[in-house]
Amino acid sequence: MSTDQQGIWEENRKTWKMRAAALLLTAVCTVGASFAAYADDVPSGPASDMELIQRREQASGSQNEAGDAQTAAGSENHAGAAEGQQTTENQETGNNGQTASETQGTEQGDSQVPDGMVASGGRYIDPNAPMVALTFDDGPYAPVGNRIMDCAEQYGGRVTFYVVGNRVNSYKSEIQRMYANGHEIGNHTQDHKYLQKLGAQEIRQQVEACNQAVAAITGEAPKTVRLPGGGKNSTVLANISQPIVLWNVDTLDWKTRNAASSVQTVLNQVKDGSVVLMHELYNASGDAAVTIIPALVERGYQLVTVSELAQFRGGLAGGTVYYSFHK
């Protein structure tokens, strides 16, 4: 190689190095900017969690029926944190009026119902056998909800979904499936606002708007209400006429995001008449549910809705708070 050619090669090599360094610096800056933007989007509390979910769903086009097919990524920040902070209280019973869901019959006539069994939700329930209500808050969210329903139905069970009213139109087909297949749809307010912080009129509006949103799809309003975060005071209780159902087994799935932890909590704490709190927004909760369901059935538990559980444990009274339905 001549001296001139070697000089040209050296100049080109220096130019390539400079270009490579510039490209690397650009990439680092881009990643850093993206990380900073994401960091700014990290929720600072339960209320902002729900707003973040909605923004991400809107950005991905999930505010229509196509949203039923979206991936779970980006939807795993939610408004359930305060729900895990609600401490278990003694059950407040109220048997002075039964407002439980009417029993849904199977296609077979009453004459074909096995002795001692009750037809409900497309299958038979033994009123004298142990039963548990699995409940899932903050949905609907079809990628997880459909997995839960698939598994529950496979094992002859039904569950309860406490839905947020402003989400139901995004997942109409999931809501329709819940209703058609005998699962229960509960009211988790319209916007997941903490009702103990609101005035009487807005409390009533939050509950009624969710009732209307569900009824517009199914033709029937939810029968029970679950308070966001479990928060209540005298104003809340005075302005909700429906039965209020909280929980006595809390998986803390919003916090752990760990299926094994949720499974262990349920299997260690569950009893006949328990109401279990989980959340529909998390893949880990779906993973836990498909393990919990067969495990409970193997232990002899029937998986029933909240209203079914109440029906066989003394009924429900409007405006009364329930944590479980133990005998």
Segments (PLM) and residue ranges:
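N-terminal Lys/Arg-rich, disordered targeting/topogenic segments
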Residues: 1-14
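Intrinsically disordered, low-complexity regions enriched in serine, threonine, proline
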Residues: 10, 52-53
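Sec-dependent N-terminal signal peptides
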Residues: 17-28, 33
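Sec-dependent signal peptide cleavage junction
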Residues: 32-49
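Ser/Thr/Gly/Pro-rich low-complexity, disordered linker/stalk segments of secreted
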Residues: 54-119
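Active-site beta->alpha N-cap acidic-glycine motif
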Residues: 107-198, 202-203, 213
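Catalytic domains of cell-wall/extracellular-matrix polysaccharide-remodeling enzymes
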Residues: 147, 180, 193-323
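Short, solvent-exposed mixed-charge patches
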Residues: 326-327
